[in-house]
Amino acid sequence: MTDLIAISGVRHAYRTKAGPLPVLDGLELSVPEGRFCAVVGPSGCGKSTLTRLIAGLMKPDQGEVRLEGRRVTSPRRTVGMAFQNPVLLEWRSILDNVILPLEIVAPRMPRAERVARAEELLDMVGLAGFEGKRPSELSGGMRQRASLCRALVHRPSVLIMDEPFGALDNFTREDLWQTMRDLRARERFTCVLITHDLRESVFLGDQVVVLSGRPARTQYVLDVDLPEDRTIDILYDRRAGDMLHLLRDQIRIAQGRDDPPAHTGSDLLPGSAAQGLTTPGAARDAGGPGGAPDGPARKTAPDGATRGAAR
Amino acid sequence: MIRKVAVPVAALALFVALWELLVWANGWPDYVMASPSDLPQSYARFWGLFLTGAWQTLWRTVAGLALAVLFGLLLGMIMGFSRTARDGLYPLLVGFNAIPKATLVPVLALLFIGQHDFNTVMMAFLISFFPIAVSVGIGLSTLEPEYRDILRSLGASRFTIFRKIALPKTLPEFFGALKVAVTLAFIGTNLVEIVSPHGRGLGALFLSGQTNSNYPLMFAVLIALAVLGIALYYAVVALEKVFAGWAERPQG
Ligand SMILES: Nc1ncnc2c1ncn2[C@@H]1O[C@H](COP(=O)(O)OP(=O)(O)O)[C@@H](O)[C@H]1O
Ligand SMILES: [Mg+2]
């Protein structure tokens, strides 16, 4: 299977009044076709910047972003995007909001066909019957569902989501995770999900990428070795618990906290979960002082991180 | 619905009654202050002049406002999309807006001698484009980037993004400004009509009332202006309901 998304050696800095602000430095990411990649990292580390690079809304200063084997230089119609703010257009009905991308991507598609496609999706996310409503008449969770439908209506090969469930309450959020899982089972797309919720990343992700603090590099990659048809209960399973602990430790490292982690990786990672660990970032760190950029992780990287690489 | 009509009508009746009472109680003759009961005669006598005057005032106001909308939208778009343009144009605009427009009457009259219609439309335009330009500029420049990105990430052109998202999204601000602009344009038209010798429109009718010491006629013109102003304002409100009605939140 080829990597649908391949990012290598990406560096990027914003030009600000106070001089260049390096945001990404040494970002590596590869997502095989059809896989779900969850990205976590400290706030302000450059996650949204990463989504904009993948979507072709910006070009990196250095390195390359490839989508479907081709280098990304400008936006592509095979991408769908969803944000924390559902950004529905208040002057359009829910149905017409969902149809919007088709007006750009398939201007000659007959209206009936567009409507049929939109209704199919709205039905899948449980919004059947709400087609004619205005966005302001819907709850936050329902708006986010509509936003997901809009992101998927033109059958993109990549869905990019930037903290889409971040503003929702816990139970609504868990409902949406399940909706997301069901959508994936029905539609084929590769997914990049930015989140600050570790449970979300483990529930939805096939892999979880931990970014370091700014400037972000790929600090850690966790392969989530759980069955495809997950239920919320799986988060209370020991394997998921171990992964959550491990991710928590990685986040602590990414934040550059010096206080020692409450758990050491070794007693928390019995066989099964540890098998799936790969960590390119850690591998580079382990390579000694050979030019790897200084990240906060180097000082405090615990056994857990390097051990995964050694396997 | 009944309340919506009954309340303003009652307020109007009360206002007219108080006016009549005030004039009657003070025993003012009609060359000091006309009373509402003097007005019907004026309307009856000069009805033809009122109709032509109102028409002239109306079309010149609307023409000036239409120019203001076109120019204001254009300027607003330029300021909304380019920071440099915004920084450069803003002080100019504010300065221009600060000039008392009465001073422009002689300037315009000298620039375009004898072009009374043109001068009037120009004044209505000059006085009213500012709020439109500013509100459209601010509306566009404060558009959240995500709104742009949902279409930009599909490779949509700037124009498509403007047409499908930025423009409709700024319509509520635009109509807010248009309500201010329509009143300003109306004032601009009347200003020129009243100040110019040989003017036309309701303003000229007012002037002739003044030169002939026909005070009831002057008051009748003022009332006619108020009615026309209200009609123009509510025409904009009706347009707003059609094009930006979605922005109205149901009141709970
Ligand atoms: N357009 C921009 N210009 C300058 N700085 C920016 C811009 N966008 C984001 N930044 C800065 O870059 C850093 C990373 O931003 P972002 O990618 O949004 O982080 P995250 O999504 O991980 O919170 C932040 O410190 C932010 O303030
Ligand atoms: Mg962000």
Locate predicted features.
Chain A
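A short, flexible loop at the N-terminus of ABC-type nucleotide-binding domains that lies
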Residues: 1-4, 13-26
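The feature captures the beta-strand-to-loop junction immediately N-terminal to the Walker
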Residues: 40-42
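Helix-to-loop junction immediately C-terminal to a conserved catalytic motif
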Residues: 55
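Conserved ABC transporter NBD signature motif
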Residues: 63-75
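Short helical segment in ABC ATPase nucleotide-binding domains corresponding to the A-loop/adjacent helical element
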Residues: 95-105, 115, 119, 223
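Conserved ABC ATPase "signature" region
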Residues: 106, 111-130, 182
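Conserved signature/switch motifs of ABC ATPase nucleotide-binding domains
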Residues: 133-136, 154
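Catalytic Walker B motif of ABC-type/P-loop ATPase nucleotide-binding domains
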Residues: 159-162
